[in-house]
Amino acid sequence: MPALPILDPADLPADAVEVGRIADAWGVKGWFKVLPYSADPEALFSSKRWYLQPSEKGAKSFFTGTVLLPIRQAREHSDSVVAQAQGVDDRDAAEALRGARIFVPRSSFPTAAEDEYYWVDLIGLEVVNREGVALGSVRELLATGPQTTLVLSFPQEGGKEGERMIPFVSAFVDRVDIAGRRIVVDWQPDY
């Protein structure tokens, strides 16, 4: 297998977003199976340049630092994605990538449909209610069955951090302003 280019960590794009990980080799011709972190893997398909980093959990890998992986093709297969990359030509090479974390530039994501948002764009947004009362900032989002839930962090007395959960549905969310870094909701602080 030809050596994959090793990039300096500074070469990871500033807008890089972790979108999945390589699960295992798939077949004998260098294909590998990817577990995307999203139900919609379009971000993986839209970028032909994936940046890999070794797993934080210590998966064995032949590389350290950041590796640029030029993608020949990627497609959905069952509940995952399979991909083929330049320089990964056999099963052994694909197995060497097992556990690697996949990053793509946020700028390569396809445009979201109206009233749809990438979770990564919502993290850190300030959430206020209709009266302008600050409820916290989005720390994470949870897929809770039929809906997504915003998990907010807010300061409490004594320096502790509080947590608030708000369903991310139109019944409670009035407006999302990505550019203004704000979400307006129909919610009260004491809910």
From Swiss-Prot:
Q: Where does it reside?
A: Cytoplasm
Name of one Pfam family that matches: PRC_RimM
Q: Which GO terms describe its biological process?
A: ribosomal small subunit biogenesis; rRNA processing
Gene Ontology annotations for the cellular component aspect, listed alphabetically: cytoplasm; ribosome
The GO terms this record gives for MF are:
ribosome binding
Which InterPro entries does this one have? PRC_barrel-like_sf (IPR011033), PRC_RimM (IPR056792), RimM (IPR011961), RimM_N (IPR002676), RimM_N_sf (IPR036976), Transl_B-barrel_sf (IPR009000)
**SUPFAM superfamilies (UniProt xref):** PRC-barrel domain, Translation proteins
Cytoplasm among the record's keywords?
Answer: yes
Where on the tree of life does the source sit, at the highest rank? Answer: Bacteria
- Indicate the segments forming the PRC barrel domain, all copies: 114-191
Q: What is its main location?
A: cytoplasm
Q: Which UniProt keywords apply?
A: Chaperone, Cytoplasm, Ribosome biogenesis, rRNA processing
- Family indicated by similarity: Belongs to the RimM family.
Subunit note: Binds ribosomal protein uS19.
Q: What does the entry's free-text domain comment contain?
A: The PRC barrel domain binds ribosomal protein uS19.
Under NCBIfam families, the record lists: 16S_RimM
What does this chain do? An accessory protein needed during the final step in the assembly of 30S ribosomal subunit, possibly for assembly of the head region. Essential for efficient processing of 16S rRNA. May be needed both before and after RbfA during the maturation of 16S rRNA. It has affinity for free ribosomal 30S subunits but not for 70S ribosomes.
This protein is called Ribosome maturation factor RimM
